[in-house]
Amino acid sequence: MNKAVIYTLPKGTYSEKATKKFLDYIDGDYKIDYCNSIYDVFERVDNNGLGVVPIENSIEGSVSLTQDLLLQFKDIKILGELALDIHHNLIGYDKNKIKTVISHPQALAQCRNYIKKHGWDVKAVESTAKAVKIVAESKDETLGAIGSKESAEHYNLKILDENIEDYKNNKTRFILIGKKVKFKYHPKNYKVSIVFELKEDKPGALYHILKEFAERNINLTRIESRPSKKRLGTYIFYIDFENNKEKLEEILKSLERHTTFINLLGKYPVFD
């Protein structure tokens, strides 16, 4: 029986595109499958599948739900990463007849200036692909969708304007999650992701964490705080850093002195 790599519906999203790219790197007989939400992906993966979920957008920031679930599902690890260029397109029937534009909230936010210039109303839906589907099924010329070229092709709609995003360096990082995987090859770049809680909330507490990395010449690629969900004003921290095989065990051991817990979320290759 084929094993599955799972992403979130609907079809035609960047999540599907990222899943297909990961499939090119994975060694083994895998099929693509899908479910309804990021949480559902984690649940399916917990039963020995693989999953692909977004974790960070260069414009809108991190995907909080993905970060929370990486902490909640402790047996699931980050196995790989890739980034996709995100280009938004106006999709529909006739640009001059559009009154309302629909899309995912992040896509609407990333095209705010373009939408404002045209004076259109906006409506948020759960995904860019769902927006394109709504426009296709409604056959309403006053509706436009913001979505990908793949979605437009899938639903046989026109691309009325290309690359309408406000910022042209728009990228989204996707991660492959699961318990284990074998890749066809290993790229040069590797990352490590951890999450931890500081032992004491006092001046300089985070400095001592960062100092451990600086003393070992380990480069951080991301640091971010999230509410601990224990009480207001308490936080946990997520850090990504470039993998240093010789110093990895040493740095993790050194961080234990300053933290109440530290979880290794994954050691993984970064694919182009």
Curated annotation (Swiss-Prot):
Domain Prephenate dehydratase per the UniProt entry, residue ranges: 4-179
Pathway: Amino-acid biosynthesis; L-phenylalanine biosynthesis; phenylpyruvate from prephenate: step 1/1
Stretches assigned to coiled coil: none
Temperature dependence: Thermostable.
InterPro entries reported in the protein's UniProt record: ACT-like_dom_sf, ACT_dom, Preph_deHydtase, Preph_deHydtase_CS
ACT domain: residues covered: 194-269
UniProt note on regulation of activity: Inhibited by L-phenylalanine but not by L-tyrosine or L-tryptophan.
pH-dependent activity: Optimum pH is 5-10.
Annotated site residue numbers, Essential for activity: 172
Any GO BP: L-phenylalanine biosynthetic process
Keywords, in A-Z order: Amino-acid biosynthesis, Aromatic amino acid biosynthesis, Lyase, Phenylalanine biosynthesis
Catalytic activity line of the entry: prephenate + H(+) = 3-phenylpyruvate + CO2 + H2O
Enzyme Commission number, as recorded: 4.2.1.51
GO cellular component, one term: cytoplasm
MF terms in GO: prephenate dehydratase activity
Top EC class of this enzyme: lyase
CDD domains noted in UniProt: ACT_CM-PDT (cd04905), PBP2_PDT_like (cd13532)
Oligomer and partners: Homodimer.
Protein name in UniProt: Prephenate dehydratase
Native source species: Methanocaldococcus jannaschii (strain ATCC 43067 / DSM 2661 / JAL-1 / JCM 10045 / NBRC 100440)
